[in-house]
Curated annotation (Swiss-Prot):
Cofactor(s) the record lists: [4Fe-4S] cluster
Phylogenetic classification of the source organism: Bacteria, Bacillati, Bacillota, Clostridia, Moorellales
Cleaved signal peptide residues: none
Designated gene of the protein: nuoB
Recorded catalytic activity of this chain's protein: a quinone + NADH + 5 H(+)(in) = a quinol + NAD(+) + 4 H(+)(out)
Family: Belongs to the complex I 20 kDa subunit family.
Main location per the UniProt record: membrane
Protein name as catalogued: NADH-quinone oxidoreductase subunit B
Organism: Moorella thermoacetica (strain ATCC 39073 / JCM 9320)
Subunit structure: NDH-1 is composed of 14 different subunits. Subunits NuoB, C, D, E, F, and G constitute the peripheral sector of the complex.
Molecular functions per Gene Ontology: 4 iron, 4 sulfur cluster binding; iron ion binding; NADH dehydrogenase (ubiquinone) activity; NADH:ubiquinone reductase (non-electrogenic) activity; quinone binding
Length: 166
């Protein structure tokens, strides 16, 4: 496989300048520095804490610091069963996050209500409250699955046109 080096169209531009758009650079930087706020409600939160430990080392992907406040975060990870009483709080946390913001639904309870979906007080999926960007299935999903979801979100942020659905 031959590699061809493209020359700039304008001879005035030197070879060591990278031509890009500001949006592409911002999306690249955003994708490599998520600041997650966690909203752990059940056993999925334990797996989320395990993903932040030394064994899985999510710091190598740029997600090492979980933020204590939604005002400092751009990613919300909802892990566990969301009850009807907790739904307004989830919405309020989402609204307090600065734009751009993303949401990951972690676990079958957050995605669809899980085994408690028939209960009178369980929300059948967090996507009825806030828009969800990535779903991480499982009961409880392993830390590797959460890392896979974070990498999928990274791809979505770098190239937002691929994820647009009309």
């Amino acid at each position: 496989m031959a590699v061809t080096r493209l020359k700039p169209a304008d001879p005035q531009i030197p070879d060591n300048i990278i031509l890009s758009t500001v949006d592409a650079m911002l999306n690249y930087c955003r994708a490599h520095s998520f600041w997650p706020v966690t909203f752990g409600l059940a056993c999925c939160a334990i797996e989320m804490m395990a993903a932040g430990g030394a064994r899985y080392d999510i710091a190598r992907f740029g997600y090492e610091v979980f933020r204590p406040s939604p005002r400092q975060a751009d990613l919300m990870i909802v892990a566990g069963t969301v009850t009807r009483k907790m739904a307004p709080l989830v919405r309020r946390l989402y609204e307090q996050m600065p734009a751009p913001k993303w949401v990951i639904a972690m676990g079958s309870c957050a995605i669809s209500g899980g085994p408690f979906v028939d209960s009178y007080n369980v929300v059948p999926g967090v996507d009825t409250i806030v828009p969800v960007d990535v779903y991480v299935p499982g009961c409880a999903p392993r830390p590797e699955a959460l890392i896979n979801g974070l990498l999928a979100l990274k791809k979505k942020v770098i190239n937002p046109k691929v994820a647009l659905v009309k």
